[in-house]
Swiss-Prot record:
A cellular component annotation (GO) from this entry: extracellular region
Key words, A-Z: Secreted, Signal
Lineage: Eukaryota, Metazoa, Spiralia, Lophotrochozoa, Mollusca
Annotated compartments: Secreted
Name of the featured protein: Serine, glycine and glutamine-rich protein
Region (Disordered): 38-80
Species the sequence originates in: Pinctada maxima (Silver-lipped pearl oyster)
Chief localization: secreted
Length: 329
């Protein structure tokens, strides 16, 4: 305290002139001096410690951001400053190397964390979720190994509705758990055209149909005669069939024969329709020429029967396929 007072007196004497005290200039300089001291102290306390970002809550690199030994960055203290239920986008890049990519990024308190991770190694990006917050992940390596440890890979920009991933792609000839980022040889998440790209622009409770647009996943009312079912690439959709009885011939009293038709019978539509069972994740599409599976954001598990191009499927915990159900028109 004595040192500060002595400094103030010395500064005041320095600004003393023949005409008297120039108090306005003195206080202005003193205020600027305080700001400089506070800014220098804050900048020195927030410097990085390890080469991977801020040490308080961001990404704290183990061996540098682009080292080839142990991957790029691991989650810091608080989970990447998700802000408690907010939306945090973390973009981390690691150079090519052995372990490849990223260890873990902790989510916030129920917040949603977008992670765009591009590791350049064959091991892919191994990403694990944080404390309660669901993750939309764009992870994996550039080789056939693909992602590991249950990595859910998405193509391009993920769309998160109610903490659920609606934009999922597990393409790539590598197949395996979670597919891969580019698969064996291929481009940006498609591999040898093995991945199936599914995009759902509809709202909650609806599924996007390639032919008919947004369709409700609830059973359609009986009065909607011309409403088409949800298009499913895996299952066969049968078109409506109308049944008519054979015409019968009758004779008028004056001898002129005529033909008449009996009233047509009740029409039915028999097709495979997904019966909505629980409000879980949106349809997840699995691909890859080697099959494999991927987990949805709410725990639903989709599956693929493999083959070139793969097949699409819905999470088993969300939809129950009711084959052959008849809906009266």
């Amino acid at each position: 305290m004595k040192t500060v007072l002595l400094f103030v007196v010395l500064v005041g004497l320095a600004y003393c002139d023949d005409d008297g005290w120039d108090m306005g200039n003195f206080f202005q300089q003193y205020h600027q001096w305080q700001q400089q001291i506070s800014s220098s102290s804050s900048s020195s306390s927030s410097s990085s410690s390890g080469g991977g970002g801020s040490s308080g809550g961001g990404a704290s690199g183990g061996g540098g951001g682009s080292s080839s030994g142990g991957g790029g960055a691991s989650g810091g203290g608080g989970g990447g400053s998700s802000g408690g239920g907010g939306l945090t986008k973390v973009v981390l890049k690691a150079g090519g190397g052995g372990g490849g990519g990223f260890k873990s990024v902790g989510g916030g308190r129920g917040g949603v964390t977008k992670l765009v991770a591009s590791g350049g190694a064959s091991g892919g990006g191994s990403v694990s979720g944080g404390g309660g917050g669901s993750l939309a992940l764009l992870a994996g390596g550039s080789a056939a190994g693909g992602g590991r440890s249950g990595v859910v890979t998405v193509s391009k920009q993920p769309i998160i509705i109610n903490r659920q991933v609606t934009h999922v792609n597990t393409g790539g000839s590598g197949g395996g758990v979670g597919g891969g980022f580019g698969g064996g040889r291929g481009g940006f998440g498609y591999g040898l055209y093995g991945g199936y790209h599914h995009y759902n622009p509809c709202g909650y409770g609806q599924v996007y149909s390639y032919y008919y647009g947004c369709q409700s996943i609830y059973k359609q009312p009986a009065r909607q005669v011309y409403h088409q079912p949800v298009y499913q690439p895996v299952q066969t959709v049968h078109q409506p069939v109308q049944y008519y009885q054979q015409p019968y011939q009758y004779q008028h009293s004056y001898g002129q024969p005529s033909y008449a038709y009996q009233p047509q019978t009740t029409k039915y539509i028999s097709y495979s329709y997904p019966q909505y069972s629980s409000q879980g994740s949106y349809p997840t599409v699995a691909g890859g020429s080697a099959g494999g599976f991927v987990r949805g954001s709410s725990g639903g598990m989709g599956f693929s029967s493999g083959g070139i191009g793969g097949h699409s499927s819905y999470p088993l915990s969300v939809f129950k396929h009711a084959k052959g159900e008849k809906y009266k028109l």
